[in-house]
Amino acid sequence: MLGAAGLAMAAYAGCVRPRLMRWGATDDEVAGPYPGADVVPKGQRGPTMAVTIDAPPDEVWPWLVQMGGDRGGWYSWDRLDNGGRPSAREVHPEWQDLAVGDYVKYWRGSQGAVDAWQVALLEPNRFLGLHGLTDLRLHNLDPNQPRPHAYTEGLWGFLLNELPGGRTRLVIGGYEAVRPRWLGRLYSYTPVVWIMQARTMSVLKRNVEHAAQART
């Protein structure tokens, strides 16, 4: 049993995990520059996932800025991350006003800045960066204060690169840090990240392309 478990773990680490860490992304998208490195001090690149959307960046952007548990949802598995409430299937004007410093709730009904991402970077039609910093009890911390001995931190980024033919390359990536460092080696969020983010990319692509086709 232990031998089989060890082989399974080795196979995951050697074959499966590397694929999940760069799902759909090119070598340049994985290794090249990505916005937000300065937001997570001493952080390292996290998983990078990418997809091509048959619509220009200005038609993808409205779907990104309306994300959130208290807004349009996360376009993922709604029973798991949106309380069973369906994510938005159209662009909502009331959720388009997003600015640096705003909080985007994880779940509907969470209070204040607790259980929320903070908008750290925002360049319309180009990049949205959501920042999270918590202690090990998942209580939000002030990024303007010195980091404690133990914490988790991450930047969740959505980069839109314009392609010829009115298309967009959506590259989801970012940076992460876990302290103490040994704690980070005990956890592997990659399968969970892949399951949820792969769904987000698929639904975003479908929604944006359907909306673009409806306008033609």
Residue ranges and their predicted role:
Residues 10, 46-52, 127, 153-155, ...:
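Intrinsic-disorder/low-complexity, polar/charged segments enriched in Ser/Thr/Lys/Arg/Asp/Glu/Gln
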Residues 23, 29-30, 132, 138-198, ...:
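Beta-strand/loop substructures that line and gate deep hydrophobic ligand-binding cavities in soluble
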Residues 6-107, 207, 214-216:
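Hydrophobic ligand-binding cavity/cleft-lining segments
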Residues 97-159:
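A contiguous catalytic/ligand-binding core that recognizes phosphate-bearing ligands
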